[in-house]
Swiss-Prot record:
The active site is at residue 22. This is Peptidyl-tRNA hydrolase. InterPro entries: Pept_tRNA_hydro, Pept_tRNA_hydro_CS, Pept_tRNA_hydro_sf. PANTHER family: PEPTIDYL-TRNA HYDROLASE. The record marks 12 as: Discriminates between blocked and unblocked aminoacyl-tRNA. The keyword RNA-binding applies. Pfam families: Pept_tRNA_hydro. Its main location: cytoplasm. Hydrolyzes ribosome-free peptidyl-tRNAs (with 1 or more amino acids incorporated), which drop off the ribosome during protein synthesis, or as a result of ribosome stalling. Catalyzes the release of premature peptidyl moieties from peptidyl-tRNA molecules trapped in stalled 50S ribosomal subunits, and thus maintains levels of free tRNAs and 50S ribosomes. It catalyses: an N-acyl-L-alpha-aminoacyl-tRNA + H2O = an N-acyl-L-amino acid + a tRNA + H(+). Monomer. Disulfide bonds: none annotated.
Length: 195
């Protein structure tokens, strides 16, 4: 059984960023909220939109920070501190350059890999890296100088379909995570690749 009490989807705020690759984490949380039939509501004290959902009979908070990506930790720490949620009880969903579109993987701990949202969350949690991540593959532009424009751009339709399929599979795997355990959820999700 999972001990996850907070699921965070990283994003930049505003309509101009809503469909950009950098917002893949938010797409996952939005899909979880839809499946759980709960509205994401703006909560200024948490600097984000949030919902209280039930997954397999257990309470979990959903959060999409409405700060910019590089200030995500302000939002995560505000909610986690208020509800006394420990880093190891947090799952952060984010876009991952080092994985192809159509792939998603769970991971516990590790560095930020250059991801500004993760970097700020780690700092805001007292440099504690021991939180869970859901890495959603978006692919890499092939040149590190093009990364900023790439993550803030929209994926072509075929790539977007693969990203969406991986998110759907991640949602199904999250249900396994809450109903069974992380090992089974990882086994299912890590063997999936959208074609």
């Amino acid at each position: 059984m999972s001990n996850i009490k907070l699921i965070v989807g990283l994003a930049n705020p505003g309509a101009e960023y809503a469909q950009t690759r950098h917002n893949a984490g938010a797409w996952y949380v939005q899909e979880l909220a839809r499946i759980c039939n709960v509205p994401l509501v703006a909560e200024s004290k948490y600097f984000g939109v949030t919902a209280r959902a039930t997954l397999h009979g257990r309470d979990v908070r959903l959060l999409i920070p409405t700060t910019y990506m590089n200030l995500s930790g302000k939002s995560v720490a505000a909610l986690a501190n208020f509800f006394r949620i420990l880093p190891e009880e947090i799952l952060v969903a984010h876009d991952e350059l080092d994985m192809d579109p159509g792939v998603a993987k769970f991971k516990l701990g590790g560095g930020h890999g250059g991801h500004n949202g993760l970097k700020d969350i780690i700092a805001s949690l007292g440099n504690d890296k021991n939180f869970h991540r859901l890495r959603i593959g978006i692919g890499h532009p092939g040149d590190k100088n093009k990364v900023s424009g790439y993550v803030l751009g929209r994926a072509p339709a075929v790539e977007q379909e693969r990203i969406n399929a991986a998110i759907d599979e991640a949602v199904r795997s999250t249900e396994i995570l809450f109903n069974q355990d992380m090992a089974k959820a990882m086994h299912r999700l890590h063997s999936f690749k959208a074609e």
